[in-house]
Amino acid sequence: MWRMRMRLLTGYLVLLALGQLPEHGALGQKYYMNFAFNNNNPDGEGGTGVDGGGGGAGGGAAGPGGGTGDSPHSQEGDGSAATDNPNDDHATSADNSLATDGDAIGKKESGGGSDGKSDSKDSSGGNDATPANGHDDDNDDSDSKDAKDRQDKEEEAGQEGKRTDHSHHSSYEISIDDSFGGRYVRSIYESSESHGHSGSNAGSNQRDNGARESSQENQDAKEVASEAPAQRAGNVPDGPETGAKEDDYEEM
């Protein structure tokens, strides 16, 4: 008999607990929604839960006018607390923890906004400090992407290619894109010479010097030939004894 009574009592307690859980869950949801609305709208009636003075006991909700801080939802909570249920303390502590966490999140968000403003000011100041010609004071290669610098380098490379000192130039254009560091190397010209310039290497211009000397000797020979007396017509000197005459082709 007593077993039947214990079963009935246990079933009654279970049903009572199951009936109280949805009520407290809905009440906690109301507290959270009210707190979220007041936190996102600080200009609303009564201000935030911190300024209202009743944010802790009332689940972070602001009272009408910021007086006692008891909202209609907190009164419902007091009425429901009249029943002897140990879960009420847990619900109140959970509401208080939610309120504290929400306040901390709101302060962090406001602090993040101020940091964003300061960052934007710093970035705008950095842009103002950049000279108009595109050159900055850092040590990276960001200046090489300026149009003026590229034109100057192309003109210098063109002038080097037009030189007539028998030097063979080969230019290589290297483009490097480093997306992590933000540094760009647009053009690097490396010239490799096969013969070298005058005075750069010993014996580098022997061919040029030899060509100049041969041209000078040819000019001197022409001057000597013009100064020599012309021979009479018909008197052709004999060649060497072992060879034929120089005008044998005329006789033949």
UniProtKB/Swiss-Prot annotation:
Keywords assigned: Behavior, Secreted, Signal
An annotated GO BP: negative regulation of female receptivity, post-mating
Tissue spec: Seminal fluid.
Signal sequence bounds: 1-19
Bias (Gly residues): 44-69
Keyword Metal-binding: no
Main location class: secreted
Superkingdom classification of source: Eukaryota
Keyword check for Signal: yes
GO CC terms in record: extracellular region; extracellular space
Residue numbers spanned by region Disordered: 42-252
Summary of the function given for this chain in its UniProt record: Responsible for physiological and behavioral changes in mated female flies.
Protein name: Accessory gland protein Acp32CD
Name of encoding gene: Acp32CD
